């Protein structure tokens, strides 16, 4: 990836984006072509958080991924890394997903 700061960390302050970009390591292309054999989403309820400001995976692709997994969909206006830019919101979404799963409501 040529610019993680612009693609993955686009909603962080420039100094924070540069820090996280410096920690990036190469990812094998095999993740794009290896057939998945036991996706957890087939056995347990899943939630997909569509990040509307994601520069790495546009929302229309995220919607396709969520649909393929029959996931419950939540949305936020975040870049690709809400765990860094919107931690409070993300924690809330995780708590809601856990509560749905515990209550037994299948998304």
Which residue stretches match the model-derived regions?
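Mobile cap/lid helix-loop segments that border enzyme active or cofactor-binding sites
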Residues: 1-9
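PEST-like low-complexity, intrinsically disordered acidic/proline/serine-rich tracts
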Residues: 13-15
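Active-site nucleophile elbow and catalytic-triad environment of alpha/beta-hydrolase enzymes
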Residues: 21-40
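Short beta-strand/loop motif that positions the catalytic acidic residue
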Residues: 42, 47-50
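Conserved loop-alpha-helix segment in the C-terminal half of the alpha/beta-hydrolase fold
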Residues: 52-77, 84, 96-98
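Catalytic histidine-centered segment of alpha/beta-hydrolase-like enzymes
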Residues: 74-92, 105-107
């Amino acid at each position: 990836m040529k610019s993680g700061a612009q693609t993955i960390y686009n909603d962080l302050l420039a100094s924070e984006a540069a820090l996280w970009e410096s920690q990036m390591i190469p990812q094998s292309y095999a993740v794009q072509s290896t057939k998945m054999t036991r996706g957890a989403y087939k056995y347990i309820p899943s939630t997909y958080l569509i990040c509307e400001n994601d520069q790495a995976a546009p929302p229309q692709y995220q919607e396709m991924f969520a649909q393929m997994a029959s996931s419950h969909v939540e949305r936020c206006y975040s870049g690709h890394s809400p765990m860094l830019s919107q931690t409070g919101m993300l924690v809330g979404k995780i708590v809601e997903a856990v509560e749905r799963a515990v209550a037994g409501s299948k998304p």
